[in-house]
Amino acid sequence: MQVIDLPLDRAGEALVAAWCRDRRLEVLAERWHCRWGELDLVTQEDSALRFIEVKTRRQTGWDQSGLLAIGPAKQRCLSRAAACYLASLGNQAAVACRFDVALVRYRSEPSAAAVKVAAWGQGYLELWCYLPDAFSAVESGW
């Protein structure tokens, strides 16, 4: 089992990046920054790019394990950051793209339903929900 020694938010991103690599996705960028914000992960599968927003939460949370934190305003910021990322690629920017969401939670014991698990602190981080095509740039108003 993988052991992650990073702050909670970065540990969740590292877990999802490892899961992507396990699935043979190429991780192009981690924590990519521009004036509009940060892209947690940018991966590539064949010729398509995935912009993956990772939400990591402790066992209990007010926002449905991070899902409510990705509202319309956050989606607009992610869409704009993705546009900046694509612009940085130059001529290669005409590729298929999608926005995925990965939900990671901290638990004292891993659950059988977890997609990927890693030891963290005195417990475990688990990728328990992965939402492909969670939203589109058009839906976010960009």
UniProtKB/Swiss-Prot annotation:
InterPro entries: Restrct_endonuc-II-like, tRNA_endonuc-like_dom_sf, UPF0102_YraN-like
Family membership noted in the UniProt record: Belongs to the UPF0102 family.
Phylogenetic placement of the source organism: Bacteria, Bacillati, Cyanobacteriota, Cyanophyceae, Synechococcales
Name this protein carries in UniProt: UPF0102 protein Synpcc7942_0312
Listed Gene3D superfamilies: 3.40.1350.10
Annotated organism of origin: Synechococcus elongatus (strain ATCC 33912 / PCC 7942 / FACHB-805)
Any one Pfam family match given in the protein's UniProt record, by short name: UPF0102
GO molecular function, one term: nucleic acid binding
